[in-house]
Curated annotation (Swiss-Prot):
GO molecular function, one term: peroxiredoxin activity
Enzyme superclass (EC): lyase
Annotated organism of origin: Metarhizium robertsii (strain ARSEF 23 / ATCC MYA-3075)
Keyword Lyase: yes
Lyase listed as a keyword: yes
Function of the molecule: Nitrosuccinic acid decarboxylase; part of the gene cluster that mediates the biosynthesis of the deadly neurotoxic nitroalkane 3-nitropropanoic acid (3-NPA) that acts as an antimetabolite of succinate and irreversibly inhibits succinate dehydrogenase and disrupts mitochondrial oxidative phosphorylation. NpaB facilitates decarboxylation of nitrosuccinic acid produced by the nitrosuccinic acid synthase npaA to yield the final product of the cluster, the lethal mycotoxin 3-NPA.
Keywords: Decarboxylase, Lyase
Protein name stated in the entry: Nitrosuccinic acid decarboxylase npaB
Domain of life of the source: Eukaryota
EC number of this enzyme: 4.1.1.-
InterPro entries in UniProt: 4CMD/NDH-1_regulator (IPR052512), AhpD-like (IPR029032), CMD-like (IPR003779)
């Protein structure tokens, strides 16, 4: 097998594995829309994210998906990437992170990222969770 064929096979395998994880975490509808709406310019970015983040990093040992989701929320808050925060809040819920844990992650990030980030993060995460409740995608636990 040539080096190019081996390289192509590796990329295909990482992409396929990445798609599975990405759909599990973010939801099939979101991932399928992202790929369907990719242009010739943005498609390589979708492939890179899927192979590298989802096909490699999210599958490494040492952290489970719940831990990775909490870590991701904090990093996204630090970057002030609010659209991504909504997306990864949904993913965190899908990975078993509770509303309480999300709130505490946001409050924890406030200490290191600043209160303006905390305020915006509270708005985004609360809206995302409420949207999931309204759509029947998430049921709040009984107290």
């Amino acid at each position: 097998m040539s080096s190019d064929a081996t390289n192509d096979e590796l990329h295909r395998r990482l992409f396929d594995e990445g798609i599975k994880v990405r759909k599990d975490v973010l939801g099939s509808e979101y991932v399928e829309n992202a790929l369907r709406n990719a242009t010739p310019f943005t498609r390589p970015g979708q492939e890179l994210i899927t192979e590298w983040a989802w096909g490699t990093v999210w599958q490494r040992p040492g952290l489970d998906r719940k831990q990775r989701s909490l870590l991701t929320l904090g990093l996204i808050i630090g970057q002030k990437a609010w659209l991504e925060l909504g997306l990864h809040t949904r993913g965190a819920i899908n990975n078993g992170v509770t509303e309480l844990e999300i709130r505490e992650a946001v409050l924890h990030a406030a200490v290191y990222c600043g209160t303006p980030s905390c305020i915006e993060a509270m708005i985004v995460t609360q809206k995302t969770i409420n949207d999931m409740v309204d759509k029947g995608e998430y049921k709040r636990p009984e107290n």
